[in-house]
Amino acid sequence: MEKEKGEEKMNDSRKITVIGLGYVGLPLAIHFAERGYNVVGLDKDKRKIERIEKGDSYIPDVSSNVLKDLVQNKQLVVYTPHTGIEEFQNSEYVIVTVPTPINKQKEPDLSALIAASHYIKQNLQAGQTFIFESSTYPGTLEEVIIPIIAQSGKEVGKDYYIGYSPERIDPANQQYTVQTIPKVISGQTERCKQQVQKLYSTIFDTVVPVSSPKVAEMCKLFENIQRLVNISLVNELNILCEKLGIDFREALEAAATKPFGFTPYWPGPGIGGHCIPVDPLYFQWKARQLGQSSQLIEVAHMINEKMPQQIVTQVKELSAPPGTVFLIGIAYKKDVNDLRESPALPIIELLVNEGYKVQYHDPYISSAKIGDKIYDSIPLKKKTLEKADCILIVTDHSNIDWNICKGMKHVIDTRGVLKKVSA
């Protein structure tokens, strides 16, 4: 059988480069390093590079002790893109996990993905395999990424290989880990897909090949579109049931006893994080390019956007400005230090605009810039809560003793956590 171009070029099949060392990239880099791969991490944020080199993790799911050991043993080395070119060129596999947010117009911001593609174009070596994991709309790999890399003069499927495998990670989830979550993979050609599978089958328990990158890209969006629609539904029903004098959580718990045909979703202050509020808007943007739109996504997004104002309205019903509102938890979900798209951000800005004084406690976020002001987390003490005019539970962190809220007046529990506190 004739070897394809580049097969003899690569000489270090155990070297992996991960571009982007955030909530997806760093745990993935650690996972590879722990399984014997020599891992190179690239990130333009010099502060991240410095912290990794010191063995100081900035992600709760990554142990500083583990990180320090891997760095000291040279199983994980980190650079900025500029200083890590040689290491990049000596890697057989390159995995891209850069952020794909939305801009102020609620449209896809592919700037980091495009920058990574240009970096690959400029430094590509024959025989390398590139795997993109960043969440994006269907067609991005074929219509945006590959045309940029093609400017190198190299041919996909012959000179280099490329595929898409949507990131699947649930921060703070101890049940489903990087290794155990099934991994969907795809390739631009059959050989590309084989290259992706060759690597990922060594570190993931289950690999799920699909027919094309577009299918894999859509898979990721569909997962989060489903969650947006269902969580927005229960948030709306929760509001309506309150006006009807019905305990919606009790009704939901009762409905959840049905062993078939029902999946429970739980209401809250609004959907946060980088994925669920963002990915559906990527799909909507792509649909609009074709003159189409999803009405269901549109309505679900609108409901989610209105949730912070709904919470502030509840606060105003209990306490008038210029009272003090004390937020417990500001991260977008429990047990993480991630503020991205957290409903706490617009809630705090709305409260300040109404004239309230705002304080917060979050065991994972010591300080946060919200609007034009920097807030510092205040220790959670009974005296502090007693002085507040309203207590607003936004994030139900596991390491908070919720008994401290018992007996307090004017508590808004957006997570239903106090129902679980023993009497």
UniProtKB/Swiss-Prot annotation:
One of the record's GO molecular function terms: NAD binding
Reaction(s) catalysed by this chain's protein: UDP-N-acetyl-alpha-D-glucosamine + 2 NAD(+) + H2O = UDP-2-acetamido-2-deoxy-alpha-D-glucuronate + 2 NADH + 3 H(+)
Binding site for NAD(+): V24, D43, K48, T100, S135, R340
Active site (catalytic residues): C275 (nucleophile)
Keyword set, alphabetical order: Carbohydrate metabolism, NAD, Oxidoreductase
Biological process according to GO: polysaccharide biosynthetic process
Protein function: Dehydrogenase involved in the biosynthesis of the nucleotide-sugar UDP-N-acetylxylosamine (UDP-XylNAc). Catalyzes the conversion of UDP-N-acetylglucosamine (UDP-GlcNAc) to UDP-N-acetylglucosaminuronic acid (UDP-GlcNAcA). Cannot use UDP-glucose, UDP-galactose and UDP-N-acetylgalactosamine as substrates.
Name this polypeptide is given: UDP-N-acetyl-D-glucosamine 6-dehydrogenase
UniProt source species: Bacillus cytotoxicus (strain DSM 22905 / CIP 110041 / 391-98 / NVH 391-98)
Encoding gene (name): UGlcNAcDH
